[in-house]
Design a protein with these regions (language model features):
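N-terminal extracellular ligand-recognition/capping segment immediately after the signal peptide
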Residues: 42-45, 59-87, 96
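Extracellular beta-strand-rich solenoid/capping regions of secreted or surface-exposed proteins
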Residues: 52, 73-89, 99-120, 125-143, ...
Length: 299
């Protein structure tokens, strides 16, 4: 899987810069060994401590233990992990997971609190933010997800991911599935800022009211490319995608299929939606609503 960001090459530069900074040799000798990023032991307390330390650095890269499930049991107070205020790359492998214990109280997993986070090859699971938005991740900074799975997270809105307050989020080669917005909108994603989704899957998420898959709220802009949005459910409108008045959603080379809602089973549009080489079909009870608001979409 490959990672991209809203500006070409940003995430790659981020990763390379961080690796170079952390791997600088102690002495300028060609034969000197280059130290690599630290590997975080398979312990939730170790992960918390590593992020706390990383927040104080100019840049940090953390390698997670291969195949580990970092099970979080306590919050501080709304998040299982320290809010991301620095410039941090977290890399997993072999099925690395960060999850909330099913016996723990309610808290989300990550809060990007004005910092920058690149999360690579990690599953984020079972976050529950209670009466706060963003069950899995709340993005209030810059977020890059590559090869990430957001699954089984719960929140009133933005159960998998909530993007707000002039934040930026780029998701590539990732999957958002089985997330549940219990209050209003955005089973997988609630976006009121800047969102890019590329080569990903938004599958089988639910929202109590609006946008079972992706909910884009004024003044948000969502750009979704080469992505499958399927089998999502909204209790009222916008089973796959809901785009509000003042918001913009651009879909390029996507498939929006087999979603369902009271109306706008595929897409509900109150603002601006552009379809380019995108299939919107087999949604229930209709593909797009209100009729005529999305050029190229058959009702």
């Amino acid at each position: 899987m490959r990672i991209i960001s809203r500006s070409s090459g940003y995430a790659s530069a981020l990763l390379l810069a961080g690796t170079a900074a952390l791997a600088a040799p102690a002495a300028a000798q060609a034969s000197a060994a280059l130290p690599g990023p630290p590997v975080v032991p398979c312990s939730s307390s170790a992960l918390v401590a590593a992020i706390q330390q990383a927040n104080g650095a100019r840049f940090a890269t953390l390698l997670l233990t291969r195949g580990c499930n970092y099970v979080l049991t306590v919050a501080a107070p709304d998040d299982g992990l320290p809010p991301i205020t620095g410039n941090l790359v977290i890399i997993g492998s072999g099925g690395t997971t960060i999850s909330r214990s099913s016996s723990a109280g309610n808290f989300r997993i990550f809060d990007v609190a004005g910092g920058r986070l690149a999360l690579v090859n990690v599953t984020v699971a079972n976050g529950n933010s209670g009466n706060q938005v963003g069950g899995g991740i709340l993005d209030e900074g810059t977020l890059v997800l590559r090869g990430v799975r957001l699954t089984g997270n719960t929140a009133p809105s933005g159960a998998g991911l909530d993007v707000q307050n002039d934040a930026h989020a780029t998701i590539s080669f990732s999957e958002l599935d089985g997330n549940n917005a219990t209050g209003l909108a955005g089973g997988a994603i609630d976006n009121s800022a800047d969102l890019v989704v590329d080569h990903s899957r938004v599958i089988a998420n639910t929202a109590h009211s609006f946008g079972g898959g992706v909910f884009t709220l004024d003044p948000g802009t969502s750009r979704i490319t080469t992505t499958v949005v399927a089998r999502n459910v909204a209790g009222r409108t916008g089973g796959g995608i809901f785009n509000t008045t003042g918001a913009t959603t651009v879909l390029i080379g996507d498939r929006v299929v087999f979603n369902s809602a009271g109306s706008g089973g595929g897409i509900f549009n109150g603002g601006t939606v552009q379809l380019r080489f995108t299939l919107v079909a087999f949604n229930s009870p209709d593909n797009c609503s209100p009729q005529g608001t999305i050029r190229g979409c058959l009702r």
